Regions:
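Cytosolic regulatory regions of ion transport systems
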Residues: 1-233
Length: 233
């Protein structure tokens, strides 16, 4: 059930009848795909992101980090290399707000680009660097007719409105997400189990998938059948 809040849900009291699901079509298991990702910038969340990505991609995937890393960061990446199995991690040193540097990366060769905030900088300075990077990326996209998905981390929620101009696909404001999560848990602590399930790589998630993966196209099926076929994968 999708609702604005938990107190706006009204059950109709109906418990059926339910039809017996029938298998239709040839169910197609979705395989993980080789992905080539680029991380621009760095902070303590970078290692967690690499480990999480490793759970979703196929062997042979790559992840390139371009950032100014400390010796401690480099040591962490070496440890992560030994812990992951699907991603080959490489590091390049460069300035993420310099357009020539970004052009030299051939960013069009990457399927995903993640822009991380430098948290050792002042909040506004870090977000300014991120916004400049985004503007350069979108300019490169238009100038060289390239297409790539960009996920951007920002430190100040107010700067998100400025980032819309740069047309990033998704924004993540970490502190704001934590605040929203804590407010939800304060109202209902049992939601923690739900979030734990959603945040696990093996847990339940929402994806857009072609209907042909679950049913034969052009044939009428009921909702229970779709659910049964999806659960069979």
């Amino acid at each position: 059930a999708i609702s604005e809040d938990d107190d706006t849900i009204v059950l109709n009291g109906s418990t059926g009848p339910h039809t017996q699901p029938k298998f239709t079509g040839e169910l197609k298991e979705a395989d993980s795909k080789v992905a080539h990702s680029l991380v621009l910038g760095w902070n303590d969340n970078g290692g967690k992101i690499i480990k999480e990505l490793d759970n979703y991609v196929a062997p042979g995937s790559t992840l390139t980090i371009m950032a100014d890393l400390s010796e401690q960061d480099m040591a962490l990446i070496e440890v992560i290399r030994d812990e992951i199995s699907n991603i080959k991690v490489t590091h390049l040193k460069g300035e993420i707000s310099d357009k020539k540097t970004l052009v030299s990366l051939n960013v069009g060769n990457f399927s995903n680009i993640i822009v991380l905030s430098y948290k050792y900088l002042e909040i506004q300075e870090s977000d300014a660097k991120t916004l400049i990077c985004l503007l350069h990326l979108r300019n490169i996209c238009e100038q060289y007719d390239q297409d790539f998905n960009i996920v951007t981390e920002m430190l100040d929620l107010k700067n998100r409105e400025l980032g819309v101009v740069a047309k990033a696909d998704d924004f993540i404001v970490g502190d704001n997400l934590v605040s929203l999560l804590l407010s939800q848990l304060s109202e209902n602590r049992t939601l923690k189990k739900v979030y734990d399930e959603l945040f696990r790589s093996e847990g339940s998630e929402i994806y857009l998938k072609p209907a042909s993966r679950y049913v034969q196209l052009g044939k009428e099926v009921d909702y229970n059948t779709i659910v049964a076929n999806a659960a069979a994968l």
